[in-house]
UniProtKB/Swiss-Prot annotation:
Alphabetized GO MF terms: acetylornithine deacetylase activity; cobalt ion binding; succinyl-diaminopimelate desuccinylase activity; zinc ion binding
Active-site residues, Swiss-Prot/TrEMBL: D75, E141 (proton acceptor)
Positions that bind Zn(2+) 2: D107, E142, H356
Name of the protein this chain belongs to: Succinyl-diaminopimelate desuccinylase
Amino acid sequence: MTAPAELSPTLQLACDLIRRPSVTPVDADCQAQMMNRLGAVGFELEPMRIEDVDNFWATHGSQDGPVLCFAGHTDVVPTGPVQQWQHEPFEALIDADGMLCGRGAADMKGSLASMVIASERFVQDYPNHRGKVAFLITSDEEGPAHHGTKAVVERLKARNERLDWCIVGEPSSTTLLGDVVKNGRRGSLGAKLTVRGKQGHVAYPHLARNPIHLAAPALAELAAEHWDEGNAFFPPTSFQISNLNSGTGATNVVPGELTALFNFRFSTESTVEGLQARVSAILDKHELDWSIDWALSGLPFLTEPGELLDAVASSIKGVTGRDTQPSTSGGTSDGRFIATMGTQVVELGPVNATIHQVDERILASDLDLLTEIYYQTLVRLLA
């Protein structure tokens, strides 16, 4: 284990944050540590406690000029069985292989530390930089995400705040730091479908209407449907049934109702309204007695090549020597809320191989490189 005195400022802060057990939506004073450091170099701080969620908004610089925002979350997922970890989940140690171990090392306290240290250095080196450096941090990303970034964005919109560019510190890298940046995400549209039949005895099927039998052809058609072709940035829209429930538990009873949960991960080639209309048409075609509850988790967003993506890619190349690959794969992130402000959004963070797993870990030296990438991006855009 590396002694604390030997650690860089980024690693010292990362370890301090990891040692705080901030299981969602608890912040465990992680944001206080970040705000203390940012405030010390002249950031204006605005804590935003919304329901049971801690958030903060911080800015440095002038209203005139572009705004570059760092976004992220201090909350982490539960550890799972602690006895399965090689080290205590919140111990934050660097092992003999140079790996920083602990819950949140990759997702995403390492990124938070890199953002803070890079921004400290930037505003000290360029005190009269153009535009603004901003932070939007929440403790509600791994949970319901109702009172975190989404709610803060609504407040920022209400007072006409502008965000030109945003770097979300999600662990985007796959094998090597910076090999992948996320320049967009698919939308997520979920639904609970209820199909009604008529309960009865299995020996008298003519007196019952089995909703499983009735719904099966419609569900099969939905699963086989080709929703769109995708495009240069997104794969085709996908449809997946995640849960099917029906029956009383008895083998001699025809159930009276079936429920199905399904989800679309959809590209910019499809719309919410279009997907809903096509689902309705298929269900009606099969003459079902049905109802549906829709839940939109987020719309798709895309940052095409331009100032932000170019600056990030150039910084990665300059620091690591490697070319990055923009990607829109994976699940949703808080970037979907920030993109509604008309903001160019990219996600850049550590290697994601162990996120949410037992023994979450990243190469400790990657965090100093990530700090330099963030710093160089700031210089390219705001110096």
